[in-house]
Amino acid sequence: GNAGQDGADGAPGGSYSYSGPGGYSYSGPDEVAGSGRLISRTIDLSGVTSVVAGAAFVVQLKTGGPAQATVTMDDNLADQIEASVTGHELRLGIKPGRSVRNATLRAEVTVGQLDQLAANGASKVTLGSPVTGSALRLDANGTGQITGPVAVDHLEASESGASVFALSGRANSMHLNSVGTSQLQGPDLTVLNLDAVLSGACQATVGVRDTLAATADGVSTLRYRGNPQITRQQTSGVSSIVQDST
């Protein structure tokens, strides 16, 4: 059982192809099946501060050195896979118009400083060490997942589709924008000042210490622990903003 083999819904033989910025769709008969014979290549990441993962890439990410990525894939997919650096950004995914199935797509990534991270398509990114710094931007869509610890001054987090942030650690301030059925699983994340906007059927759980400003629409739910001063609390539909007493 390899983590890279399932489609977004766990269906065998599912495949993703690129269809515009950040978008993936099931595709047709000209897809390439992974051979099962794995190859790896190393990419220099000097100066890279942004990582964008797509398709079904499984990424282990940490900060430190040396700044490089080791990308592992089936040996017959090298022409289908995008693993390249442009400016300060590493992009991992499938080339536009290409399609793969039963593929192993893995990357071990080390950057000196992380400012932006995106998990698109069905990618999964795990942070192996706390991300530090003044500001960190996280984006996730599709069924993308970002998991791990943060320790930053400001956290800007945006998620859509059925994506998941599973975060721990702390941030002095956080702005969260969630749509679709996305989730913020942050029972071990503490934010001093949170501004959250949720719509659709989103779920968010987070610790808030000083101030909370929140808007929830649709059937979304924000659960917070702590006793912050509430500066905005707007709900509509059957959405809710509730203090978690557990």
Q: Where do the language-model regions lie?
A:
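Short acidic/polar N-terminal linker immediately downstream of export determinants
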Residues: G1-Q80, E89-T110, T126-L127, S239-T246
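Extended, compositionally simple hydrophobic/Ser/Thr-rich segments
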Residues: S40-I43, T49-L61, E89, L105-S245
